[in-house]
Regions:
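Structural detector for short beta-strands of small beta-barrel domains
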Residues: 1-27, 78-98, 128-130, 156
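Residue-level recognition of conserved beta-strand positions in structured domain cores
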Residues: 45, 61, 103-104, 112, ...
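Beta-strand secondary-structure signal
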Residues: 31-33, 58-60, 89, 101, ...
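Beta-strand elements of well-folded, non-transmembrane domains
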Residues: 63-65, 92, 136
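Acidic (E/D-rich), amphipathic helical modules within compact regulatory domains
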Residues: 27-75, 81
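Mixed-charge, glycine-accented linear interaction segment located at domain edges/termini
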Residues: 109-156
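Short loop/beta submotifs within extracellular cysteine-rich repeat domains
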Residues: 39-42, 67-69, 108-111, 137-140
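Short, solvent-exposed interaction modules
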Residues: 67-122
Length: 156
């Protein structure tokens, strides 16, 4: 099981949240377009109400792959293959059962669903290259809003 709840998933993987820049979008749309490093990707936002503001954002990027290779010949990279599909290549920095965190220039949490004839699950330190199934997802980390302390002068 990849997740029991959105909140549980965010709590488990928030340490691997990526920093990016979200672009403006239609109000209420779950499709989030975000620049991660030098790549612009479209992700399905799982942490409604789908109101992540345009501008700087922290998010857990998540995809599921059924096939992968243990190959790092091209180095770390993240590429968009189409709406909500990613090509991920990089070093595995953490593994928890069948979920790995890949350093693809930005952290990407990838759920691996192994095929009977596929390679074994990678371990931390291994290189992996995979293509995620659609839809790749974004779990936006909502930072608490810090309000300035009102001064007596503000009340005049």
């Amino acid at each position: 099981m990849l997740e029991e709840s959105v909140e549980g998933f965010v709590a488990r993987w928030r340490a691997h949240a990526a920093r990016g820049t979200a672009f403006a979008r239609l109000e209420g749309s779950p499709l989030l377009e975000v620049a991660l490093g030098e790549t612009v990707v479209q992700l399905f936002e799982r942490t409604g109400p789908y109101d992540a503001p345009a501008g700087p954002v922290r998010l857990v990027v998540h995809g599921v792959a059924t096939r992968w290779s243990l190959d790092g010949s091209e180095g770390p990279s993240l590429a968009a293959l189409g709406p909500a599909r990613l090509r991920v290549s990089g070093r595995v920095v953490e593994r928890d059962a069948d979920v790995v965190v890949v350093d693809a220039g930005v952290p990407v949490v990838v759920g691996l669903m192994p095929a009977d004839d596929g390679p074994s699950l990678p371990e931390a330190g291994d290189w992996i290259t995979c293509e995620t199934l659609a839809p790749a997802q974004a779990f936006v980390i909502r930072e608490p809003v810090r309000r300035a302390v009102a001064s007596p002068d503000d009340q005049v």
